[in-house]
Amino acid sequence: MLIGLLQDDATRSYAMLGKAVGLSSGAAHERVRKLRERGVIRRTTIDVDQEALGRAVTAYVLVDGNTWMGDSGDRLAAIPEVEEAHVIAGPASVLLKVRTSGPKELQDLLRQVFQVDGVTGTQTVVVLQTLFERTLK
């Protein structure tokens, strides 16, 4: 329950968290500290409106490679528009979630992906509309 409350609004005070789950603020603070210590809570972040920042195009890029692409994480992470990168089982080696300001910038990003050692091809799926995004609780 604490995790769900923090996912909804990580700025809530320990007093508010404690009240919501029937604990004192000190006990809520201690539980959150333990969750961080155990690695359950890895970081505290914000939810940014990407369109407001000029990143209106969201796409998923399937990356094919002729080597183990799991070793390419640092190179892919160096491309600022790459939001997520996952080694996958299926029709490609890696799945990227990317955000760019437009089609030209998406094409520029794909050129950068092709410069990563071992990349032999890509398939890109452009998002037309996001129905919802959520973090599972």
What feature does the model see in each segment?
Residues 1-137:
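A compositional/biophysical signature of low hydrophobicity enriched in polar/charged and small residues
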